[in-house]
């Protein structure tokens, strides 16, 4: 798949999104910062990537997801948990960055911060019904299928 990428900050030419390994599902996104940013415990900030994408095809969307190491080791996750980039969005990719940890975290310029995953999308249409055809599960939810 070819994807239109717009470089909004010339410094990002050296830090384009890339797959870390041949088996990687996510492209690494980096913090486009002029200076280090310190996130205090509980603080959230919006971090620019210096990049914009245009998927164009409504059959695709992009997800901005946290990097597992930052979350596990430092408590750095996404403030919105998952960022959804619609196919018609053309603005800068921004990363809502939340320090849910107990200590301050310093985010350095061009540090890998999140990952971008391209996913297929199916746009549903609704068929309004008065009743559903009964299923084995029915309305059971939140633990209704048991623990084991």
UniProtKB/Swiss-Prot annotation:
Q: Does the keyword Disulfide bond apply?
A: no
Q: According to the UniProt record, what class of enzyme is this?
A: hydrolase
Instruction: Give GO BP annotations, semicolon-separated.
Output: dUMP biosynthetic process; dUTP catabolic process
Q: Which UniProt keywords apply?
A: Hydrolase, Magnesium, Metal-binding, Nucleotide metabolism
Question: Is Ribosomal protein one of the keywords?
Answer: no
One Gene Ontology term of the molecular function aspect = magnesium ion binding
EC number in record: 3.6.1.23
What SUPFAM superfamilies does UniProt report for this protein, alphabetically? dUTPase-like (SSF51283)
**The reaction(s) this protein catalyses:** dUTP + H2O = dUMP + diphosphate + H(+)
**Pathway annotation:** Pyrimidine metabolism; dUMP biosynthesis; dUMP from dCTP (dUTP route): step 2/2
Cofactors: Mg(2+)
**What InterPro entries would the database entry show?**
dUTPase (IPR008181), dUTPase-like (IPR029054), dUTPase-like_sf (IPR036157), dUTPase_trimeric (IPR033704)
**Disulfide cysteine pairs (residue numbers):** none
Give the residues the record marks as binding substrate.
67-69, 80, 84-86, 94
Per the entry, what this protein does is:
This enzyme is involved in nucleotide metabolism: it produces dUMP, the immediate precursor of thymidine nucleotides and it decreases the intracellular concentration of dUTP so that uracil cannot be incorporated into DNA.
PANTHER family linked: DEOXYURIDINE 5'-TRIPHOSPHATE NUCLEOTIDOHYDROLASE (PTHR11241:SF0)
By sequence similarity, the record places it as follows: Belongs to the dUTPase family.
HAMAP family associated with the record: dUTPase_bact
Q: What is this protein called?
A: Deoxyuridine 5'-triphosphate nucleotidohydrolase
Q: What organism, scientifically named, is this protein from? A: Burkholderia cenocepacia (strain HI2424)
């Amino acid at each position: 798949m070819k994807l239109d990428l717009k470089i909004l900050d010339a410094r990002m030419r050296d830090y384009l999104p890339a797959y870390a390994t041949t088996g990687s599902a996510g492209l690494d996104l980096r913090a486009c910062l002029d200076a280090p940013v310190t996130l205090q415990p509980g603080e959230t900030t919006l971090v620019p990537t210096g990049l914009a994408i245009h998927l164009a095809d409504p059959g695709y969307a992009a997800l901005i997801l946290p990097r597992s190491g930052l979350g596990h080791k430092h408590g750095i996750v996404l403030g919105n948990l998952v960022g959804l980039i619609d196919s018609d969005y053309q603005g800068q990719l921004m990363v809502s960055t939340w320090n849910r940890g107990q200590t301050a975290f310093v985010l350095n310029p061009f540090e890998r911060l999140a990952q971008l995953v391209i996913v297929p999308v199916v746009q549903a249409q609704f068929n309004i019904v008065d009743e559903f055809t009964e299923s084995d599960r029915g309305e059971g939810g939140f633990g209704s299928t048991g623990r084991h």
